């Protein structure tokens, strides 16, 4: 409902210059990212005659454990994603985009820091108490399905994404995307098939300081690989967020991202339930129009398929 309201307000708002929006966001947990073409795609104002470049680095700590007599799921890893993107306007209404990514999965080094961080906030993560520090683990054993055994890998190519966008209103856009299975990583990290999605974003400039954005996404990912029998093919996502300018070109942002379940009937809450995450941080702008992002992402649904904590860094040029 908040997303639909934001879309309606954006459609009714008078046309004009659209202010900068929120940073992009996509799931990084391999059991989620390997099953969806959906993400949060920020609104792109018209920039004639220039290429827009983006670079983003995400480093995440994931700890999820589910164990019942007939099935077991463990993900204990630190995850790296470095994404490079390019886009260009073809007309005031249409644009194209493409991005590629480098990924990594490690035993890591952050567990001690995260114990202190969660203790400071009074957050209890029992899964961390049951696991040794900085030890990699990634496997899924489901009843009547072949087991998935993920392994660490220092650096590998992820899937590639291509898209065509249309601004259907001065503050509303739709982007059709496809992902190509270009991953060179081990089993359990790439999609393995072509997937497709439609990402819709609405931007609402509330004032000179405050702007809101909401999104709705629909996607299709064919069943594939070891866990094919338990995978959903039709997927949906939504988000609602805001950006508040503090002074000059410096802003705070927050974005709540929701994704429907990626799997079904596994008896594993971390696989069968929806994904809910809060992305937040600061945006530092320059007089040249460049923008830098420093942020974090927290899992708001610990029993769902998310990660414990993501550190986010990025830039737009």
Regions found by a protein language model. Name each.
Residues 15-56:
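Outer-membrane beta-barrel biogenesis signature
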Residues 23-28, 58-81, 148:
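Surface-exposed strand-loop-strand hairpins of Gram-negative outer-membrane beta-barrel proteins
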Residues 42, 57, 82-88, 98, ...:
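Residues on the lipid-exposed face of transmembrane beta-strands in outer-membrane beta-barrel proteins
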Residues 55-61, 98-102, 174-180, 214-220, ...:
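Transmembrane beta-barrel strands of outer-membrane/channel proteins
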Residues 76-82, 155-160, 190-196, 230-236, ...:
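Residues that define the transmembrane beta-barrel architecture of outer-membrane proteins
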Residues 93-98, 170-174, 208-214, 248-254, ...:
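Repeated loop/turn-to-beta-strand initiation elements of outer-membrane beta-barrel proteins
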Residues 101-233:
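Outer-membrane pore/translocation modules
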Residues 116-148, 227-317:
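Outer membrane beta-barrel transmembrane domains
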